Amino acid sequence: MDFVNNDTRQIAKNLLGVKVIYQDTTQTYTGYIVETEAYLGLNDRAAHGYGGKITPKVTSLYKRGGTIYAHVMHTHLLINFVTKSEGIPEGVLIRAIEPEDGLSAMFRNRGKKGYEVTNGPGKWTKAFNIPRAIDGATLNDCRLSIDTKNRKYPKDIIASPRIGIPNKGDWTHKSLRYTVKGNPFVSRMRKSDCMFPEDTWK
């Protein structure tokens, strides 16, 4: 997948259905991306790179597309895939995963079962046992990788405003969150909108 030359919004859509693999020391975790958010850098008031701000914690966001930007929010580890060329702080937040391999270990790691295991940006990273130290690593050159060949394809994609970013003017309302329609592993999914996971893919 080209993380440098494509538009960040398009990358966020293209990532839906892509297989994520995390190889721990004794356990392999896999699942399919069902929810993403695009963050558009310098002009995006909700982005960590807004206005060109650089601090030690966001250094990875300014690296070349394909870098992993991992940051902690409210004690939860959030994983972003950096996009664009070095120096342009854009990226895609991976918000939710439909789990596949390593389910029993995920249940242990999370202390939860069912859709709650991976239906949020801090939930799936805890389920996969991903450490903060992965920040700055290159996707597919470390324990975290994606498989764009053995993937799924959404039947429908819904675009909506991003979660949890009030008071950012127009950026609060821009439809930069992308979800697999009806997939029950999407965060904040209403039960009435849920479908069986297998019915949400082509």
UniProtKB/Swiss-Prot annotation:
CDD domains xref list: AAG
Domain of life: Bacteria
Keyword list, A-Z: DNA damage, DNA repair, Hydrolase
Annotated EC: 3.2.2.-
GO molecular function: alkylbase DNA N-glycosylase activity; DNA binding
Record keyword Transcription regulation present: no
The UniProt record lists the keyword Magnesium: no
Any Pfam family hit: Pur_DNA_glyco
GO BP: any one term: base-excision repair
PANTHER family xrefs: DNA-3-METHYLADENINE GLYCOSYLASE
NCBIfam families noted in UniProt: 3mg (TIGR00567)
Family: Belongs to the DNA glycosylase MPG family.
Protein name: Putative 3-methyladenine DNA glycosylase
Organism: Staphylococcus aureus (strain bovine RF122 / ET3-1)
